[in-house]
Regions:
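Alpha-helical solenoid repeat scaffolds of the TPR/TPR-like class and their adjacent stem/linker regions
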Residues: 152, 159-181
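Residue-level signature for tetratricopeptide repeat
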Residues: 12-13, 48, 52, 85, ...
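Catalytic glycan-binding domains that act on GlcNAc-containing polysaccharides
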Residues: 21-39, 45, 54-57, 61-85, ...
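Alpha-helical segment of the N-proximal tetratricopeptide repeat
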Residues: 5-17, 177-204, 208
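Long, contiguous interaction/recruitment modules in multidomain scaffold/adaptor proteins
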Residues: 1, 144-162
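Alpha-helical tetratricopeptide repeat
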Residues: 4-9, 43-47, 76-80, 114, ...
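Polar helix-capping/helix-linker motif
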Residues: 1-4, 109, 177-180, 188, ...
Length: 421
């Protein structure tokens, strides 16, 4: 019906400009309408509310609108937005409904399997708890990424203290010398060709080895790149092995004495600093972002000026490219924002990427929130993935730095309520 279509469009426009008004009036507007129209109206407002969290903040009425729209087919994007809203507010039955509304491929992703288990165990009955435990066990055995590590924690497993250290054979290293793609990449590197060319050639060589499931060749390439100090490409190759892994290449620890010393001087965990540095620059000291952040810890010039002032130093733009100074400033700044954000490393990690004010704005204002819920509900996808990656990296670095068996949740304390100042 055209009239209903116009109404849905009009309510969508209202929600775009004044979400609170749309949420407050949606039940009054829809009360005498056919059920499918009511669902469409609720879905429209729920979707807009879920995609404008950066502007409007979190609102339980947005989740209610999604709940009221249940029964209509969900697009993959709508289902994910619904799931994250439900996760944010701990509405576990809604989490299950949202995941059930996803495509088969989508719901089989590790993140949604993890949240299906998290939601199922909240039901409390033996069947649901057993189903959740089976999912956790499967995830715990299938990898060592963020959701795999969380799953290990849920069933009481600690991440093993002996990181994989598979070495390439002599034969693998001989084959590396003969591989035309890797030979070109190393030749370009040796003549200091522009990074765009060396990286392109390297990535192509890695892709060919990966498509052949040639872990030995990938490890040989990673070892040689690591020995050359070409850490970002060593990581790129080591990340793509399927059965044979070497985490000293995958989680490189260059400048270890410097990182450990400066981290300890400001009271932060060196494994966390390494986890962040790996995510920021892959240890490319000359890395420069499109917004001007530079160096190993990708420090913005204004941040460097602030840190220099706090440390009683005169700011020098060249400091960003000096390895020692970049690490010293980066660890100081990370410690500084951690102190501003309830001494919580998850909040500080989000703040390092998106700014401390945003990380604080995303804190709950109604009750404390588990760190995995906070992380999954971060409205910026870049920051959401960033926090997951840094926490995962830090867990692996904890092992490599001799900190013993790791529990990722020990790095992710509960997120406190936001203090209104």
């Amino acid at each position: 019906d055209a009239d209903y279509a116009y109404l849905i469009y009009a309510l969508g426009r209202v929600a775009d400009s004044d979400l609170s008004n749309a949420l407050a009036n949606i039940q009054r507007v829809t009360q005498d309408m056919p059920a499918p129209v009511q669902k469409y109206l609720n879905r429209t407002v729920g979707y807009i509310g879920g995609t404008t969290v950066m502007k409007n903040g979190f609102n339980r009425d947005v989740l209610n609108a999604f709940d009221q729209s249940y029964g209509l087919p969900f697009t993959p994007e709508e289902a994910e937005i619904y799931a994250r809203q439900a996760i944010r507010f701990g509405s576990w039955e809604s989490v299950i409904r949202a995941i059930d509304s996803m495509t088969m491929t989508q719901r089989q992703e590790d993140r949604w399997q993890y949240w299906l288990a998290r939601a199922s165990e909240q039901r409390g009955d033996k069947g649901s708890k057993k189903a959740a435990e089976e999912i956790y066990k499967r995830l715990a055995m299938s990898g060592e990424d963020y959701h795999n590590l969380l799953a290990k924690d849920r069933i009481g497993q600690r991440y093993n203290a002996s990181a994989p250290q598979e070495q390439p054979s002599v034969s693998d290293q001989t084959r590396l010398n003969q591989d035309i793609h890797f030979r070109r990449a190393f030749a370009l590197r040796n003549i200091d060709a522009p990074a765009v060319y060396t990286t392109r050639e390297w990535n192509w060589a890695v892709r060919q080895a990966y498509l052949k499931h040639d872990d030995g060749l990938l490890l040989a390439a990673a070892k040689r790149a690591s020995d050359m100090g070409w850490y970002d490409r060593a990581i790129y190759a080591a990340d793509r092995t399927e059965k044979k892994h070497n985490y000293t290449y995958r989680y490189a620890t260059p400048h270890q004495a410097t990182v450990v010393s400066h981290s300890r001087n400001v009271g932060i965990d060196p494994a966390w600093a390494y986890g962040l540095m790996r995510q920021e620059s892959r240890f490319v000291s000359a890395a420069r972002s499109h917004v001007g952040a530079g160096g190993l810890m990708q420090i913005m010039p204004n941040t460097a000026k602030l840190v220099a002032k706090q440390m009683g130093e005169t700011y020098n733009p060249a400091a960003l490219t000096d390895t020692n100074t970049n690490i010293r400033y980066g660890t100081f700044y990370l410690s500084m924002i951690q102190n501003q954000l309830s001494s919580n490393p998850v909040l500080a990690t989000a703040g390092y990427n998106a700014g401390p004010n945003r990380a604080k704005r995303w804190q709950p204002d109604y009750q404390s929130l588990s760190a995995d819920q906070y992380t999954e509900s971060i409205p910026l996808s870049e920051t959401r993935d960033y926090v997951k990656n840094v926490m995962t990296n830090a867990t692996h670095y904890g092992i490599l730095l001799g900190q013993g068996p790791q529990i990722i949740e020990s790095r992710m304390p509960t997120i406190p309520m936001r203090s209104i100042q």
